[in-house]
Every structure is written in structure tokens, then in C-alpha cells.
Regions:
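Conserved hydrophobic positions within beta-strands
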Residues: 14-17, 62, 71, 79
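Nucleotide phosphate-binding site architecture
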Residues: 60, 80, 87, 125
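Short glycine-rich, polar/acidic loop-and-turn segments at beta strand-coil junctions
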Residues: 32-34, 66, 75
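Short, Lys/Arg- and Gly-enriched loop/turn segments at beta-strand edges
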Residues: 63-72, 89-92
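Short, charged beta-turn/beta-strand-edge "cap" motif at the junction between a beta-strand
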Residues: 59-60, 65-66, 85-86, 110
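Short beta-strand segments of a lipoyl-like beta-sandwich/carrier module
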Residues: 40-48, 53-54, 69-84
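A short, compositionally biased micro-patch
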Residues: 11, 20, 64-65, 74
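Acidic, low-complexity mobile loops and tails
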Residues: 1-58, 91, 95-129
Length: 129
């Protein structure tokens, strides 16, 4: 069974969203369920800092020994940070998807109330059951 932290928000595409100290910046990554389905991750194409992203549109990709999967932006905004350590050690996503395996940070305006289709932990758990 995969881990689903209660304090995060989720998408149907298996991304997670975490609040940061700045109320307009959110950290994103792929869920434990997603990394488990992908298998051993060998490469990640990160979004670029300064790039504008649109919710539910592709912003990167993850390559594993099984397949290539697109990463969808869970929020509309601008990329303000990426986890460049994943360039050399993408497998960290497998071992710590909610911690050191984070992918990017997105600056948004309007807060999460304006974000479409975000799921609570119980709703995401139902989706993956």
C-alpha cells in the first residue's frame, strides 16, 4: 500500500502539492502510488525556472525502466525552483517521493481555492484503492 500524507493535496494524474512558508509558492512532485507504478526511475525532465505552466498541462516527464510518463502541472503559475539534484539521482523519487524527491516549486496568485480538481488525502486514497 502506498503512503498518502494527509497534509498534501493531490491530482487525478498522481501529482502532489505541498504548501511552503510563502503562501503563494507550492512544492510539487509525483505520488508514492505513481512512483510505484513506474518502477525504477532513471531520468527526469524538469521544468525550467521562470517557465509559465498551466494546470493539467504537461510540464515535464519521468522515465523509468518500464515506461515514460508525463508530469502534469497541478497548478497554473510560474516555476520558481526545481530540484536539480534529480538530474544526477532521479531514483530519489522512488525512495522519498514526498521529501527529497520533490520536483519543482510553482508560484501562483489566488491560492489553492482557484486550482481545479485538487483532491484531499481521503479522496486520493479512494482514487487509488
Amino acid at each position: 500500500m502506498s503512503s498518502i500524507p494527509a497534509e498534501l493535496k493531490y491530482t487525478k494524474e498522481h501529482e502532489w502539492i505541498a504548501a511552503t512558508a510563502n503562501p503563494e509558492i507550492f512544492r510539487i512532485g509525483i505520488t508514492d502510488f505513481a512512483q510505484g507504478a513506474l518502477g525504477d526511475i532513471v531520468y527526469i525532465q524538469l521544468p525550467k525556472i521562470g517557465e509559465s505552466v498551466t494546470a493539467e498541462k504537461v510540464c515535464g516527464e519521468v522515465e523509468s525502466t518500464k515506461s515514460v510518463s508525463e508530469i502534469y502541472a497541478p497548478l497554473t503559475g510560474k516555476i520558481v525552483a526545481v530540484n536539480s539534484g534529480l538530474d544526477k539521482t532521479p531514483e530519489v523519487i522512488n525512495s522519498d517521493p514526498y521529501g527529497s524527491g520533490w520536483i519543482a516549486e510553482i508560484e501562483i496568485s489566488g491560492g489553492l481555492a482557484d486550482a481545479p480538481g485538487l483532491l484531499s488525502a481521503p479522496d486520493y486514497e479512494q482514487l487509488t484503492a
